[in-house]
Design a protein with these regions (language model features):
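Single conserved hydrophobic/aromatic residue that forms the stacking wall/gate
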Residues: 1-12
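N-terminal transmembrane hairpin
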Residues: 29-33
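Rossmann-fold NAD(P)-binding glycine/threonine-rich loop
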Residues: 34-63
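NAD(P)-dependent Rossmann-like dehydrogenase/reductase catalytic/cofactor-binding core
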Residues: 144-218
Length: 218
């Protein structure tokens, strides 16, 4: 039997476990869907109950609790937990057509951080772009409409070809003058963000263009 705690905050998962652990759990598979929490952290002492704990995390942004589940068939699932029955848990999702990968408990937090950067922090960057567009006279709706082809096209290219082959723009070209103009039109906080992101872009650009001199941008 597979029992799961879905859609609960990490603190509440522990509370649910505290209510469950004195039940008859022999041979049960207990699963949670947290990205950052390991099975051992969520279900302390589960081995004493004769049960097996697993973290089953979909790499998927659930932005709408009523409709997001319809797209879960495309999600990549990352599983962590007791190795004894791990393949049985994976088989559930393999049979549904989902790709599955195993991860060690020690890597859960960094893995979840990677997912958050890709999903949540991208939203923050897009908001920064929308704010700049509005300073140029766009309203938010028209700015979003104007930027949509860039956003969607770029993400599609990255998904198909990776970041190195998808990189374009003034940093990739080592266009120092344009980068300087960009910095001059930003406030101090925006400049900090631009510089930090540009450092990452430079490292990608060096992979794409090994012979190009990025020294003046560093």
């Amino acid at each position: 039997d597979v029992l799961g705690s879905r859609g609960l905050g990490d603190v509440y998962k522990r509370q649910v476990w505290n209510q469950m652990k004195d039940m008859s759990l022999e041979g049960k598979f207990i699963c949670h869907c947290s990205g950052a929490l390991s099975a051992g952290d969520a279900f302390p002492g589960i081995d004493k109950c004769g049960a097996f704990g697993y973290s089953v995390h979909p790499l998927f942004a659930v932005s709408d609790k009523y409709n997001s589940y319809k797209e879960l068939s495309h999600a990549y699932f990352v599983i962590e937990g007791d190795e004894k029955h791990r393949e049985e848990i994976a088989g559930i999702f393999n049979n549904l057509g989902n790709e599955v990968r195993y991860i060690a408990a020690k890597d859960k937090v960094k893995y979840h951080c990677a997912a958050a950067v890709c999903s949540n922090h991208v939203v923050a960057l897009i908001q920064e772009s929308l704010d700049l567009m509005q300073e140029c006279g766009f309203d938010e709706e028209s700015a979003l409409k104007a930027l949509a082809p860039i956003m969607l096209g770029n993400m599609q290219h990255i998904a198909e070809r990776g970041t190195v082959n998808s990189l374009t723009g003034p940093v990739e070209r080592a266009d120092v003058k344009t980068v300087e103009k960009h910095l001059n039109c930003l406030d101090e906080k925006q400049q900090m963000l631009y510089r930090l992101l540009s450092e990452v872009l430079i490292s990608i650009g060096e992979k794409k263009n090994p012979g190009r001199d990025y020294g003046r941008l560093k």
